[in-house]
Amino acid sequence: MAREFSLEKTRNIGIMAHVDAGKTTTTERILYYTGKIHKIGETHEGASQMDWMEQEQERGITITSAATTAQWNNHRVNIIDTPGHVDFTIEVQRSLRVLDGAVTVLDSQSGVEPQTETVWRQATEYGVPRIVFANKMDKIGADFLYSVSTLHERLQANAHPIQLPIGSEDEFRGIIDLIKMKAEIYTNDLGTDILEEDIPAEYLEQAEEYREKLVEAVAETDEELMMKYLEGEEITNDELKAAIRKATINVEFFPVLCGSAFKNKGVQLMLDAVIDYLPSPLDIPAIKGVNPDTDAEEERHASDEEPFAALAFKIMTDPFVGRLTFFRVYSGVLNSGSYVLNTSKGKRERIGRILQMHANSRQEIETVYAGDIAAAVGLKDTTTGDSLTDEKAKIILESIHVPEPVIQLMVEPKSKADQDKMGIALSKLAEEDPTFRVETNVETGETVISGMGELHLDVLVDRMRREFKVEANVGAPQVSYRETFRASTQARGFFKRQSGGKGQFGDVWIEFTPNEEGKGFEFENAIVGGVVPREFIPAVEKGLVESMANGVLAGYPIVDVKAKLYDGSYHDVDSSETAFKVAASLALKEAAKSAQPTILEPMMLVTITAPEDNLGDVMGHVTARRGRVDGMEARGNTQIVRAYVPLAEMFGYATVLRSATQGRGTFMMVFDHYEDVPKSVQDEIIKKNGGNA
């Protein structure tokens, strides 16, 4: 079957925003106007097409990034709707990794909000070009130019309007196109009847001012255009559009549009902008990877002629077809029924069926091409971030960074029947979500689940009940602490056992030094002259890794430490891998005496929004919770406080804030970094855990 849409006519986009900015409604309207659905589903009625999980429809928020494909102006647009809630950050990260462009949706009353900053930062890390859609122009307090100013102030983004609204709140009735210098007036409720006319006289001066600002800003990114502009020559609409496209794709410029998805205004123009300004797979740099056989860096271009290479970015369990693996094809062609190599795991996988997804309905297709996003049935060993490639042209693509979980809960099944089902349910949920971890406490036999926040674990426990019919008791949330060393030290680990039969002998000298935050554990072999034989070196590293899983102070994992094995000795007969593993763990215990071990706790970036009258209360809350204020901002009669607060102090804060502000205060928090706990708190944690120190 030949390719339906050329690569030039393909767009892979994500829709990203702060929770409640109207992102899912915007996606719904896109599906409506592109002919994918015939009736519009409203999020607040729990009928949205993209939010297809029961919990999503009940809570009115998007949890998983549903993928769908639509058509507009003879182009194929693959859309991923991502969650705006911080607990589901991995969903945003994995979609950004496989997208070519994104639409950032703002609530035009609030402008840039905390989660907008988080997803914007992530999109910048991945180099994703963006256009901005200032939504909810019909809402009381909507202010388009204020929203644009927040893009400059909070994100330092080179963002400029390519449209202006005609009216706002109840009076919002159309849009001025600053490129064509025409007005688009909406004459019916469904937004399908649009009149193009001259700009109303009362808006003309403002339109000319912003057109001038737009031309100047775009000219700064394009030398040729700059010369024309400075010489006072006429810049044609086509030249302006081409320059905006180029600057947007280079992530140097962000076009800002406006509208109201709920009132069906501005969505078609936003779709036009997706086609006009966001990149096709051909416009983005070739994907880089490593050949697992040669360790050489290789790249794959967006071409059907190159060998097949794809990245699995999401696993989902579908009630009808079972395990679905969502993947983005970077190069080559894949047919259903064929075999691929999972180079990340070194496993051969058979592609049973290939499905094109539309939220939770599906259409079976025979072939996928470079630039496509699809789902496959039949992959057994593939997980998020794995590379799938042609067996004869291996490449491992850069994987997806998975943040460490910061909160944990104990779960126990209510009955023996639930016990067996719970194991299956938890492993399936962990397959789908890499930030969700399941561990069994060896000493107590308890099952501990960890995740990115209370809502995250709440939703997963809820899914366990609904989808897998498992009833479970859930404990109170606990913080995932870590341990580290703050001083450098050298330590010997000596293990010798002679008691009849074969003896054991292992002897190592290891230098431990603190590592940079977030770097994890790094091992260096500095043995010279074979004082520790090469075959035992991996055993030393393994012994350290295993011992570090259970820290020296309170049993929390040790992180961010470098270990350099520099000396030791061995016995011709009695030395073994086991002996060197034990010796390494003894060296770690010895080092702990002088390496200033300390406990680390997760620090959250908390953004509290409260009425001005309650500012004193909020500042008191932060101080009482061992927090430190990072910044404040007044917005009308509301104050926004940003602070770093330990996660351990934030449990139950929603209730405290609600009662202090009569229900008018809200807060959001996102994990930021780990920090040393104060000595008094450390002593408490050690005591509570029957400390190892």
UniProtKB/Swiss-Prot annotation:
Name the predominant localization: cytoplasm
A GO molecular function held by the record:
translation elongation factor activity
- Read off the PROSITE patterns from this record: G_TR_1, G_TR_2
Picking any one GO biological process from the record gives: ribosome disassembly
As for subcellular location, the record says: Cytoplasm
Question: Which key words are in the record?
Answer: Cytoplasm, Elongation factor, GTP-binding, Nucleotide-binding, Protein biosynthesis
Show the CDD domains listed in the entry: EF-G (cd01886), EFG_III (cd16262), EFG_mtEFG1_IV (cd01434), EFG_mtEFG_C (cd03713), EFG_mtEFG_II (cd04088)
UniProt-listed Pfam families: EFG_C (PF00679), EFG_III (PF14492), EFG_IV (PF03764), GTP_EFTU (PF00009), GTP_EFTU_D2 (PF03144)
Per the record, its GO cellular-component terms are: cytoplasm
Residues reported to bind GTP: 17-24, 81-85, 135-138
Stretches assigned to the tr-type G domain: 8-282
* NCBIfam families noted in UniProt: EF-G (TIGR00484), PRK12740.1-3 (NF009379), PRK12740.1-5 (NF009381), small_GTP (TIGR00231)
Q: What does this protein do?
A: Catalyzes the GTP-dependent ribosomal translocation step during translation elongation. During this step, the ribosome changes from the pre-translocational (PRE) to the post-translocational (POST) state as the newly formed A-site-bound peptidyl-tRNA and P-site-bound deacylated tRNA move to the P and E sites, respectively. Catalyzes the coordinated movement of the two tRNA molecules, the mRNA and conformational changes in the ribosome.
Family that this chain belongs to: Belongs to the TRAFAC class translation factor GTPase superfamily. Classic translation factor GTPase family. EF-G/EF-2 subfamily.
Q: What is the protein name for this chain? A: Elongation factor G
Higher taxonomy? Bacteria, Bacillati, Bacillota, Bacilli, Lactobacillales
